[in-house]
From Swiss-Prot:
GO molecular function, one term: arginine-tRNA ligase activity
Ribosomal protein listed as a keyword: no
Catalytic EC class: ligase
GO biological process, one term: glycyl-tRNA aminoacylation
Protein name per UniProt: Glycine--tRNA ligase beta subunit
Signal peptide positions on this chain: none
Enzyme Commission code: 6.1.1.14
Primary site of residence: cytoplasm
Subcellular location: Cytoplasm
Record carries keyword Repeat: no
SUPFAM superfamilies per the UniProt record, alphabetical: HD-domain/PDEase-like (SSF109604)
Source species of the chain: Dictyoglomus thermophilum (strain ATCC 35947 / DSM 3960 / H-6-12)
Assembly behavior: Tetramer of two alpha and two beta subunits.
Length: 689
């Protein structure tokens, strides 16, 4: 029978975004550790607050399982003679503290040997737990690690106390100069009297009694209960991002929801400014009325009880008023001038130290946009809209509002463009080029915004690729993963017929690096893009489909997307298995570096190879142009594939491909190679499961 185990790591306040990754790591490590140590357990629970990381293991076994091991001893003919164990065998068992009854003889590849079957008793869990605690804390990786004082230990934030209990027994361990005990600490809003934890079983209740809700799910539900109660009692509608709830949950240990308000005059500001100020700057929950209009009310989550709540509300209202007053000033100052005026400031804003200013970037993007427009054959009106949009799309970076609220770039550009009287759809293009900002964000509704977004991201990535600023491990300070993710979604879902590699090469030319940076950096960049693309596609398609399609190239995302959609549907058809099997047979026989020649009909002697050649010509004439155009779905209704698959099988069953006659052999290999190349236009069939 096991006991419950408790480990509480008390720290200084941990940034909210550090906590979820730590929870996952602690859970995985704990399961793996005790599995490897062969100690049974019922469940592992990881709880967290801003100041505590907690492992709670239910019914952790009191000792390791006994392990049976076999030790090979001397050869049987030495240790066992005339039905008796020899002195050699006796010395062998004495060496391991065993008896002759534990010996047996087994046949091995090297002959018969004596083996000792020994049961190794498991260690007590109490002896193992100090190592578990130390190993666990050393294993956790945070987005940023820190060292404090003169201790040689790295963690997300300084460790201040450790509680470690197995049942009611203290586990003695010292980490980063902190010795474990059974005493936790109260929240900061209470007198700092240590909290005694008598045993692991009583932990949650003792913490609740001291105004600490350790379980993040319980805490989140408490927040939801309270904010919904306030909203319902006042006939308001809650409207907030999911990330806000997650962040607030990791900012408090004992949540209390309070209703505050601000001056109605600030409702004249753009709604997005109010929401960003409340959600991002202050972590408040905005409230709407029954008609969906934003109100001048908000909910703040206090870390503590409702004692002195009026003072707390007034303090939060005062802080919000100051922020909104600043925003009002920025807005009024910004709107004194048309948006175009702020383009003058772009030459003073650095894009990247070695890649120039934002103005330099705009000029590069302008050339790239013209190139894309030419490739796509845009109309003169569409070209004019794009030209004007390029002029203005970074202008809001020169405004006061975006200087204070960088996350509003593009969004304020759209608002200011409308106020400045820019004609539709220019404000829309300016405001939407930023999307998607994350992998699950929305896409632009206007394809011209997609073009601008593609050009902007291509320019950024080309510069970073040239400078070799690739992410290392989990670190990605420039945000290459985010930028490339947005680019890939635009290319995959916009269906614009563009070649990604060619755009990178063109962008590289526009930068005019000269001999400073090699063009080969684009190859390295495409490798990085390929890995990002594969990860993105694996969320939607099976691994064999993704690898089969990517193997034939991913320069043209529109083709890749069509190939993926085609094979996903084709897999459901009866002809799929036959064609895959036939083509795989063909793939296996072709030498890797074989270069096909033109097939000579005069050398086709067998009726089976003649028929296969006719099949090849038929497919080439009837649907190959469709395949080249990316119309792969024509194959879904192409009934000839069944007959073609049968003819490949008949060819292999009746024709000697590797003929002793060299001309005949090369001719047959050339026919097979041409068939492979024809279907290679779609995917690598050998990778399909």
């Amino acid at each position: 029978m096991g006991k419950n185990f408790l480990l509480e790591i008390g720290t200084e306040e941990m940034p909210a975004h550090f906590i979820d990754p730590a929870i996952r790591q602690m859970y995985d490590f704990s399961l793996e550790y005790f599995k490897n140590k062969k100690i049974s357990l019922e469940s592992v629970k990881i709880w967290a607050t801003p100041r505590r990381l907690v492992v709670y293991i239910e019914n952790l076994g009191e000792k390791q399982e006994a392990q049976e091991e076999e030790i090979r001893g001397p050869a049987a003919h030495i240790g066992y003679k005339d039905g008796m164990w020899t002195e050699v065998a006796k010395r062998f068992v004495e060496q391991y503290g065993a008896s002759l009854e534990d010996l047996h003889i087994e046949e091995t590849p090297k002959g018969k040997y004596i083996f000792l079957r020994k049961v190794k008793e498991g260690m007590n869990t109490l002896e193992i737990l100090p190592d578990y605690i130390t190993s666990l804390l050393k294993s956790i990786r945070f987005p940023k690690m820190m060292k404090w004082g003169d201790v040689d230990f790295y963690f997300g934030r300084p460790i201040r106390w450790i509680v470690a209990l197995y049942g009611d027994t203290e586990i003695e361990v010292e980490i980063a100069g902190v010795k474990s005990s059974r005493y936790s600490r109260p929240p900061r809003f209470l007198p700092q009297i240590p909290i005694e934890i008598r045993d692991a079983d009583s932990y949650l209740n003792v913490m609740r009694e001291n105004y600490i809700i350790v379980d993040q799910e319980e805490r989140k539900n408490e927040i939801l209960k309270q904010i919904n109660k306030i909203a319902n009692e006042n006939s308001f509608i809650l409207d907030y991002e999911d990330d806000l709830l997650k962040e607030v949950n990791y900012l408090v240990e004992y949540p209390t929801a309070l209703l505050g308000e601000f001056d109605k005059k600030y409702l004249a500001l753009p709604e997005v400014v109010l929401i960003i100020t409340m959600e991002k700057k202050q972590r408040y929950f905005p409230l709407r009325d029954a008609d969906g209009n934003l109100t001048n009310k908000f909910i703040v989550i206090r870390n503590g009880t409702d004692n002195y709540k009026d003072i707390v509300i007034q303090g939060n209202e005062k802080v919000l008023k100051a922020r909104l007053s600043d925003a009002e000033y920025y807005y009024h100052e910004d709107t004194k001038h048309p948006l175009e005026k702020y383009t003058e400031k772009l030459s003073g804003i650095i894009f990247q130290e070695q890649l120039g200013t934002i103005k330099d970037k705009v000029e590069r993007v302008r050339i790239l946009v013209r190139e894309i427009a030419n490739i796509l054959g845009l109309s003169s009106e569409e070209n004019k809209i794009l030209e004007r949009s390029v002029n203005l799309y970074k202008a809001d970076l020169g405004t006061l509002m975006v200087s204070e609220y960088p996350e509003l770039h593009g969004i304020m550009g759209r608002i200011y463009a409308k106020i400045s009287g820019e004609k539709d759809p220019i404000p829309e293009v300016i405001g939407e080029y930023i999307y998607p900002r994350t992998l699950d964000d929305r896409l632009p509704s206007n394809f011209l915004a997609s073009i601008l977004g593609i050009a902007d991201r291509i320019d950024s990535l080309t510069g970073y690729f040239a400078l070799d600023l690739f992410p290392t491990g989990s670190e990605d300070p420039i945000g290459l993963r985010r930028i490339s993710g947005g680019l890939l979604r635009l290319l995959l879902e916009s269906s614009l017929k563009l070649n990604l590699r060619n755009l990178f090469v063109k962008s590289f030319e526009i930068y005019n690096f000269g001999e400073k940076y090699p063009l080969s950096q684009i190859d390295k960049g495409m490798g990085f893009i390929g890995q990002r693309l594969r990860n993105l596609l694996l969320d939607r398609y099976s691994i064999d489909i993704v690898d089969a399609v990517m193997e034939v190239g991913y320069d043209e995302m529109w083709r890749l997307k069509r190939r993926l959609d085609f094979i996903s549907k084709f897999k459901e058809k009866e002809s799929y298995e036959k064609l895959k099997k036939a083509l795989n047979r063909l793939y296996r026989i072709l030498p890797k570096d074989f270069t096909p020649k033109e097939v000579s009909e005069n050398l086709l002697s067998s009726p089976f190879e003649k028929k296969l050649y006719e099949d090849y010509l038929k497919i080439k004439n009837e649907i190959f142009n469709d395949i080249l155009e990316g119309n792969y779905e024509v194959l879904l209704s192409y009934d000839f594939l069944n007959e073609f698959s049968d003819d490949i099988e008949k060819f292999f069953d009746n024709v000697l491909v590797m003929s002793p006659n060299e001309d005949e052999r090369i001719n047959r290999l050339s026919l097979l190679s041409l068939i492979k190349l024809l279907f290679w236009e779609i995917l690598d069939w050998s990778r399909l499961s």
